[in-house]
């Protein structure tokens, strides 16, 4: 399952150089010190396995989501002329992009691009020249394939230029707004002056480009080859989780495939140690999952479970419940009833065959780590706590006082067992309560907490209260703010796809103001890397941490 170099990626290899057809999803070089999941590191490992020298020279790079040709030198004899050719801009490079909108006639695009800020490059009249030849290869409706020959090498140059002329690259999570099975940009041609002649390399266009032109917006999950390729890209995107820097505490539970963000909106796949959970989001009838299950089973999991998620079924009867979330695995062997998984070295219990939920929300992994880091000696209120994973993180971090609240008794009993089974020092309470009714009572009793964590469902209903994410956050934030100790923090999180982070923060600040409190610090976090953003939409999960005066 761990990403490895595939020899099929090699276009040509000699004693002096190697040309690789990089797949989408793989970084060219390490993005963080100690990581070994990028193409350069994987290629070096492959050469060592062959008993060959692993020294390679890197002369160019492609964005992680761009596929195509990369040339590496293997000897100093080759490195010097290849490096000189790239530095002198004597190398001819050609790309093909799948775009949505009218790219216009064949022409030269001329822009000035500013410096990269907050991950984005923008057109800036005071920026540096960006020049690209554009040639239209094919058009079908509002879609087109275009060939691009850049004459300059600015960061994100092709992506920004195409977006600016009204034809953004499909699947581009930063500059596009149109879904696709991946970002449709491929380096197809490379011509390098070398040894008195030239090296010429070409790469065939991946099949998803033609499928895009024919109207595809997501991978067909019944096509085993297409889905397997899509899943492989998703695994490479998560290379940092499979191969973290040496000495990193163990994390063996995370999302392997995230719906639209990885190219198939009907499918999500989670890893729980040696087991997998497949989520099928079904709008109309049951999905045909044979190809997905076969691809998943080939990864080497001991077993895999299925959760069918249907919008129209909120509280299914027992028979329907078993059909949606079978207790038995759909392949392999059954997991223990209570399985121990790990995040950043902390153990959490989960139940893979016990209904639609497992006992932990994996998209909150990094927020649990953050809470762990600020918990020593502190008090923590965990609202809408489910099975208490945030409380576990706080207690493991050294919190001395916690209160864990949820309306579901089974969830609270699981939280109690998970927390108290660690024999923590301090006082740790658990309440089966309607959060909305409890908050005023806590305020009247004068209870205060250093950290208040609130992560409600997008829609919640109790006997006396209804909550709908949006403006209802104002009242909830006001009630929570009154329970935060001066200098403490409100940790608010939502997976409401309708709200962007700024709108979410505005609701929170209005609530805090209504409570007569002020904000003296803020941090905003998006989802972790295994929950990639959907092009054109806000991140699905948003967390705002506000320090309150």
Name every feature range the model reports, one short phrase each.
Residues 489-549:
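C-terminal catalytic and target-recognition region of SAM-dependent MTase-like enzymes
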Residues 401-406:
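Conserved SAM-binding motif I beta-strand of class I
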Residues 259-263, 270, 286-361, 369:
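Non-catalytic substrate-recognition/targeting regions of SAM-dependent transferases
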Residues 411, 432, 449-479, 485:
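Mobile active-site "lid"/loop adjacent to the S-adenosyl-L-methionine
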Residues 1-219:
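RNA pseudouridine synthases
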């Amino acid at each position: 399952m761990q990403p490895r170099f595939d020899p099929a990626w090699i276009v040509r290899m000699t004693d002096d150089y190697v040309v690789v057809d990089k797949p989408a999803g793989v970084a060219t070089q390490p993005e963080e010190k100690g990581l070994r999941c990028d193409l350069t590191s994987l290629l070096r490992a492959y050469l060592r396995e062959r008993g060959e020298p692993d020294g390679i020279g890197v002369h160019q790079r492609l964005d992680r989501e761009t596929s195509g040709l990369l040339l590496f030198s293997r000897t100093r004899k080759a490195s010097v002329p290849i490096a000189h050719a790239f530095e002198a801009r004597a190398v001819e490079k050609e790309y093909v992009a799948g775009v949505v909108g009218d790219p216009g006639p064949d022409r030269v695009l001329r822009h000035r691009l500013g410096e990269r800020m907050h991950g984005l490059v923008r057109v800036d009249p005071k920026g540096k020249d960006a020049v690209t030849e554009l040639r239209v290869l094919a058009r079908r409706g509002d879609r087109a394939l275009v060939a691009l020959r850049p004459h300059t090498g600015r960061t994100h140059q092709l992506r920004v230029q195409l977006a600016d002329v009204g034809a953004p690259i499909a699947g581009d999570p930063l500059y596009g707004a149109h879904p696709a099975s991946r970002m449709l940009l491929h380096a197809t041609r490379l011509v390098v002056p070398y040894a008195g002649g030239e090296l010429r390399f070409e790469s065939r266009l991946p099949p998803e480009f033609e499928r895009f032109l024919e109207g595809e917006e997501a991978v067909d999950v019944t096509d085993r080859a297409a889905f397997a390729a899509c899943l492989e890209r998703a695994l490479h995107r998560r290379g940092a989780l499979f191969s973290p820097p040496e000495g990193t505490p163990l994390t063996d539970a995370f999302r392997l495939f995230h719906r639209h963000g990885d190219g198939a909106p009907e499918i999500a796949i989670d890893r729980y140690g040696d087991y997998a959970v497949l989520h099928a989001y079904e709008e109309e009838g049951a999905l045909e999952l044979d190809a997905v299950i076969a691809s998943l089973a080939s990864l080497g999991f001991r077993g895999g479970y299925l959760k069918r998620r249907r919008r129209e079924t909120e509280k299914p009867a027992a028979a329907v419940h078993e059909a949606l979330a079978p207790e038995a695995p759909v392949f392999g062997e059954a997991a223990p009833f209570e399985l121990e998984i790990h995040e950043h070295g902390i153990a959490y219990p989960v139940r893979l065959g016990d209904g639609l939920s497992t006992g932990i929300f994996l998209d909150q992994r990094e927020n649990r780590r953050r809470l762990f880091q600020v918990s020593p000696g502190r008090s923590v209120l965990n609202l809408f706590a489910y099975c208490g994973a945030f409380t576990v993180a706080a207690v493991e971090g050294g919190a001395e006082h916690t209160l864990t609240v949820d309306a579901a008794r089974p969830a609270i009993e699981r939280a109690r067992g998970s927390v108290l089974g660690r024999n923590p020092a301090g006082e740790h309470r658990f309440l089966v309560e309607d959060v909305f009714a409890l908050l005023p009572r806590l305020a009247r009793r004068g209870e205060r907490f250093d950290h208040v964590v609130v992560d409600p469902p997008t829609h919640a209903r109790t006997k006396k209260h209804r909550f709908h994410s949006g403006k209802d956050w104002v009242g909830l934030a006001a009630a929570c703010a009154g329970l935060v100790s001066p200098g403490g923090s409100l940790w608010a999180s939502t997976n409401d796809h309708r709200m962007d982070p700024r709108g979410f923060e505005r609701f929170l600040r209005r609530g805090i103001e209504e409570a007569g409190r002020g904000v003296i610090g803020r941090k905003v976090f998006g989802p972790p890397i295994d929950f990639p953003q959907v092009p054109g939409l806000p991140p699905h999960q948003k967390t705002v941490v506000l320090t309150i005066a």
